[in-house]
Swiss-Prot record:
Name the record gives this protein: Chaperone protein DnaJ
Named cofactor requirement(s): Zn(2+)
Zn-finger segments (CR-type): 144-226
Assembly with partners or alone: Homodimer.
Cofactor note: Binds 2 Zn(2+) ions per monomer.
Binding sites annotated in the UniProt record for Zn(2+) 2: 174, 177, 200, 203
Lineage: Bacteria, Bacillati, Bacillota, Clostridia, Eubacteriales
Domain commentary: The J domain is necessary and sufficient to stimulate DnaK ATPase activity. Zinc center 1 plays an important role in the autonomous, DnaK-independent chaperone activity of DnaJ. Zinc center 2 is essential for interaction with DnaK and for DnaJ activity.
Protein family membership: Belongs to the DnaJ family.
Length: 387
């Protein structure tokens, strides 16, 4: 199946701005996110398609290539065929005026023909994303909480404000490349003589030189910092949920925007409750007599103890629902339920009075006590031997 146009995937027109692309991605990612569409294979595929489109369109380099060549820019074949160059003589032709077409020749001859790569080296670049694994308790996941975390990340140097130059000075235009970040080199190849561009070896492609570096960042413009960040955990999160903190990742190069910080949540299990989605399960041990006669019991919930009337004749394995006593739905809209699973306990040891009472119960029920005693050494005698 042919791939859909990446702009179409995000609901955009070709030439959309970076901000439009980012807004469209957030909207579509939220629409098709697996957490919102559990078990929906179509939504899962759409979510993957949206991420693939955004991965290309958010990157200036990839976006430029896609705008020019479409999917062929990334399918490995490049979409270009048609024989070799047999006998072609460039005759000193300068490919630097051919824009993106020069990028194709760059892979063959090592330099840049279009100059695009070096110019992009000067441009602000988005910083890398970070991930932090956060452990929280069962109760914190149910009700939400605030957690302070400590991370180490790259930030702009506060002394030089990201310029890399000592306070009171500023970077100078590179005298070798005149600020372009690239120099032209004539190369002799089997195809003839070519004029190509390559990264300036004096400024490293930035177009600037720092004569008096900042003493704090040593001319880099960035420093590593330890930061404490307060993370607000919404009620209802579960293990594997990810909380994005926009702009809290690594600082981008050349004063570019910072990346994002992703908090991956891990919830510790409860000692008494089990969780399935937004519902909570609790095993309540009840005596055989109370299950038969009915009783009012006290049941623990995440909100505190509640009273519940167990009806007479409750059977082992019966589940009772406590409506609204489960986990809040993480996207809002109420809470799940708590289910109380009745575990009827049969006594392992009986005293004489209990034994007689049960025998009396059997007789009242029309059952023969003699039949029980004669089988398997007697029902009650086995309990006595265990004492």
């Amino acid at each position: 199946m042919a791939k859909r146009d990446y702009y179409e995937v995000l609901g955009l027109q070709k030439g959309a701005s970076d901000d439009e692309i980012k807004r469209a991605f957030r909207k579509m990612a939220m629409k098709y996110h697996p957490d919102r569409n559990p078990g929906d294979k179509e939504a899962e595929e759409n979510f993957k398609e949206v991420n693939e489109a955004y991965d290309v369109l958010k990157d200036p380099d990839k976006k430029a290539k896609y705008d020019q060549f479409g999917h062929a820019a990334f399918d490995g074949s490049g979409g270009f065929g048609g024989g070799g160059f047999g006998g072609f003589d460039a005759g000193g032709f300068d490919f630097s005026e051919m824009g993106g077409f020069g990028d194709i020749f760059e892979s063959f001859f090592g330099g840049g023909f279009g100059g695009g790569s070096s110019r992009r080296r000067n441009a602000p670049q988005r910083g890398a994303d970070l991930e932090y694994r956060l452990n929280i308790t069962f109760e914190e996941a149910v009700f939400g909480c605030e957690k302070e975390i400590s991370i180490t990340r790259t930030e702009n140097c506060e002394t030089c404000h990201g310029t890399g130059a000592k306070a009171g000075t500023s970077p100078k235009t590179c005298p070798k490349c005149n600020g372009s970040g690239q120099i032209r080199v004539q190369r002799q190849t089997p195809l003839g003589s070519f004029v190509s561009t390559t990264t300036c070896d004096q400024c490293g492609g930035t177009g600037k030189v720092i004569e008096d570096p900042c003493p704090d960042c040593k001319g880099k413009g960035t420093v590593r910092k330890n930061r404490k960040i307060t993370v607000k955990i919404p009620a209802g999160v579960d293990t594997g949920n990810i909380i994005p903190l926009r702009g809290q990742g690594e600082q981008g190069a050349n004063n570019g925007p910072a990346g994002d910080l992703y908090i991956r949540v891990n919830v510790a299990p409860s000692k008494i409750f089990r969780r399935e989605g937004s519902d909570i399960y609790y095993d309540y041990k009840i005596s055989m007599a109370k299950a038969a006669l009915g009783a009012e019991i006290t049941v623990p919930t995440v909100d505190g103890n509640v009273k519940y009337k167990v009806p007479a004749g409750t059977q082992p394995g019966t589940k009772f629902r406590l409506k609204g006593k489960g986990v809040p739905h993480v996207n809002g809209g109420g809470r799940g339920n708590q289910y109380v699973h009745m575990v009827v306990e049969v006594p392992k040891h009986l005293n004489k009075e209990q034994e007689e009472a049960l025998k009396a119960f059997m007789k009242a029920s029309g059952e023969s006590v003699d039949d029980i005693d004669e089988k398997d050494e007697g029902f009650f005698s086995k309990f006595k031997k265990k004492k």
